[in-house]
Amino acid sequence: MLLIREIMYCKPGKVRAMVDKSLAMAKLSEETGMGKMRVMTDFCAERYWTIVSEFEVPSMQAFEEMMKGEGQSPEITKKYEKLMEGYHDLVDYGRREVYKIEG
C-alpha cells in the first residue's frame, strides 16, 4: 500500500479557494469508490499557505491508472476537470510525495 501526498503552495489569499476545490475533489473521489482523501492546511509548516491532500492506493500501477482516469466514465472525468478548472491561478507550485506504508 502506498500513501500519496500532494503538497500545494498557494498564492497569498488563495488558500480557501484551493481548499474548497480539494474538498470537492475528495468528496467526488469517495463517491466514485476511489477511497478517502484527507485535506489539510498548514498550522505550522515549511511555508505559509500550504495545502496537503493525501490518499492511499494499493500500487503505483493503480495510482497511474487513477491519474489517467482509467475505469472512469466520461461524465466523472468531466466532473474532475470542472472541479480543477483554474487551479493554476491559485497555486505557486507543488510537489508529490509517495510513501510505502509499512504498518
Range-by-range predicted roles:
Residues 20-38, 56-95:
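An amphipathic, aromatic/His-enriched active-site/gating alpha helix that lines ligand/cofactor pockets
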